[in-house]
Amino acid sequence: MVSSNQDLLISPSIPYGEIAVPPSKSHSLRAILFASLSKGTSIIENCLFSPDSQAMLTACEKMGAHVRRIGDSLHIQGNPDPHHCHPRYFHMGNSGIALRFLTALSTLSPTPTLITGSHTLKRRPIAPLLSSLKQLGAHIRQKTSSSIPFTIHGPLSPGHVTISGQDSQYASALAITAALAPYPLSFSIENLKERPWFDLTLDWLHSLNISFLRDQDSLTFPGGQSLESFSYSVPGDYSSAAFLASFGLLSSSSKPTILRNLSSQDSQGDKLLFSLLKQLGAHILIGKHHIEMHPSSFSGGEIDMDPFIDALPILAVLCCFAKNPSRLYNALGAKDKESNRIEAIAHELQKMGGSVHPTRDGLYIEPSRLHGAVVDSHNDHRIAMALAVAGVHASSGQTLLCNTQCINKSFPYFVIAAQTLHANVRHYQADFPLRSSFCR
């Protein structure tokens, strides 16, 4: 894991090698939640253990689930009727998924639930989801209309509502709630963004035998359904794979970088990033359970970020090495992640000599020779890992990457993985002068 020693020192290097990709965060969190709401005992193999996973597990235990960890697996005895518990308190840590999903599920209970989280979670929008839940009859008390903390309870009333699609997690949260409601619920999604991630939630519901009708972006759930226990092995995380792949793609090595533990049948949105890179000319071989990256040049261009918006930071780094300028667009949602990713990655890459400029809904990037610099993660795991890739492929100089404990959110063993691929990434030691003057 990224240790309490929170900074990384990165030197230009020539990555290559073979490695297993860590488990998917999105699948792990959904598996934990669905297992906790199922009848019987579910077994989840190869689960990602991270602060977000712990936040979800803690909340699910408060809803009556019993959890045992055995190695890299979880045995979860679910509580299919968790909605008549004593008043509850959910601390969501820094998990946007836990915040949105459990907020909506709390409306199935007449028992008030206090929902809060870390100070950084307060910047994650929740108002559009709360507005739709209120229209269905939810009772909500909050100090401010736009963030945690707040108290929420149901019951909801049968009916139809429109939900904002600006963040796909709003629609996913409502779909999960409607799936388990004792009465019919339907909703329409307005201007759905990040569509692959919503489809991933529906794939889960379908695999668990939940019935619903879908007419484009309108869904109807009949009510009165329940979940049965299941066994599931979490596949690799395409979002994390993007960083490892970038180590290899930009390398000057003659050897490939091979990423294992990936499923070509998976519906994760960031899987589409690899198809995009192939279209731009990158030498990538996509197998059933692995991806092979060969160092190669590739073109930039006009890139619609909506299908893989979480990849904006690493794609910004890659586009610095493209043969021609790039415009990343349709990425407004990137402003409301763990950081304003548009501003954050542009600011930090500019320190490294990158010609990276924010636009209204994305970035304009010109090919640039990057150099080492002192940069900061903005407490965002994807910004941190993207900057690590940039530092490894800088043309000169070391990079001090400050405040990297956030990487634990999705890739606790990122430093070990980078080193396995022969990237010179290590925890900060005292040989870098004047650290306290730069890393706050």
UniProtKB/Swiss-Prot annotation:
PROSITE patterns: EPSP_SYNTHASE_1, EPSP_SYNTHASE_2
Location within or outside the cell: Cytoplasm
Main location (coarse class): cytoplasm
Pathway(s) the chain acts in: Metabolic intermediate biosynthesis; chorismate biosynthesis; chorismate from D-erythrose 4-phosphate and phosphoenolpyruvate: step 6/7
EC number per UniProt: 2.5.1.19
MF (Gene Ontology): 3-phosphoshikimate 1-carboxyvinyltransferase activity
Catalysed reaction equations from the record: 3-phosphoshikimate + phosphoenolpyruvate = 5-O-(1-carboxyvinyl)-3-phosphoshikimate + phosphate
Enzyme class: transferase
GO aspect biological process, one term: aromatic amino acid family biosynthetic process
Annotated binding of 3-phosphoshikimate, by residue: 25-26, 30, 168-169, 310, 337
Superkingdom classification of source: Bacteria
UniProt subunit comment: Monomer.
Task of the protein: Catalyzes the transfer of the enolpyruvyl moiety of phosphoenolpyruvate (PEP) to the 5-hydroxyl of shikimate-3-phosphate (S3P) to produce enolpyruvyl shikimate-3-phosphate and inorganic phosphate.
Family classification: Belongs to the EPSP synthase family.
HAMAP family reported in the protein's UniProt record: EPSP_synth (MF_00210)
Name this polypeptide is given: 3-phosphoshikimate 1-carboxyvinyltransferase
Gene name, Swiss-Prot/TrEMBL: aroA
